[in-house]
Amino acid sequence: MKVYYIVEKKKGSAGWVTEHQEDLQKQLKEIEKWEKEQQKVWFWDKLSRLPFQLLDKLTPDFIHKKIGTLLDEVGSFIQTGGQYLTSEKQIIKHFQKKLPDEAIDSLQDVQKAPLAIMDDIAESMGRNRANAAAVQGATTGVGGVFTLAADIPAVLGLSLKTLQDIAVAYGYDPKEKKERVFIVKCLQLSSADIVGKKSILKELKDYDQDSRTYKSAASQIQGWREVVYSYRDSFGWKKFFQMVPVAGMVFGASANRSALHSIAETGMMLYKKRRILERLKETE
């Protein structure tokens, strides 16, 4: 996505970025086009959700219990962030390297950075996490179904960290519950069926403009397990083939990289949209 911006330096202030309104509008239209594409039904999406009905039958009970335990641990994220909180300071350092002539010390400074820099850092974060997920998938693919039990919760953790990295890259604070709810919604959108995608996109349309939107989004997360099982089912055939010992390495790496790429793209689009809308509001 091509980004347009100009820089105006102001001595003693971090408010040195302006972006033309018409350029912001152009980028917003590209994101809205992407949103419409997400609401199309693809044959592979339908097909990919079938095998977990078989996988549930083939998976031993002790592995089901292990997955359940790990998912319960992940459930604390929405309330406290738990062990999945990201390193805000490390991401701020990336901004400082990109903008060496400016003082970038906080999220407030990040919020005023050029969108082009935000995009670049967010893409880098997503790419690094996708590579880590591929290694995770290849490792767990060695042992087939017995190591698959640990893979999905591990990738879920990487997904949460990826979305938090992207949130920070666009100047939002994942320590706030409002942002963790938004992150869960991004995760849901990346793995939902067409009905779910339409509902979530409609739900998030005015996330910052209307406080009722946030409250509605939070109340509609009926249970973390529902989010997790929808996420799990979206892996489909790729994870099904990962059950094959050794050969599962290839399928595991591919499935995980694909999943993290989709999640990173979703996070970038939705967080960038919020930042653009805020900047457009500032130009009114």
Predicted regions and their residues:
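Conserved mixed alpha/beta catalytic, RNA-binding, or beta-rich assembly cores of soluble enzyme
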Residues: 155-159, 166
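Active-site metal-coordination segments of metallo-dependent hydrolases
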Residues: 152-156, 173-174
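Terminal, membrane-proximal amphipathic helices
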Residues: 1-136, 165-284
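Short, conserved micro-motifs enriched in small and acidic residues
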Residues: 150-153, 254
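A general alpha-helical scaffold signature found inside nucleotide-binding enzyme cores
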Residues: 158-161, 258
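Transmembrane alpha-helix interface/packing and boundary motifs in multi-pass membrane proteins
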Residues: 136-149
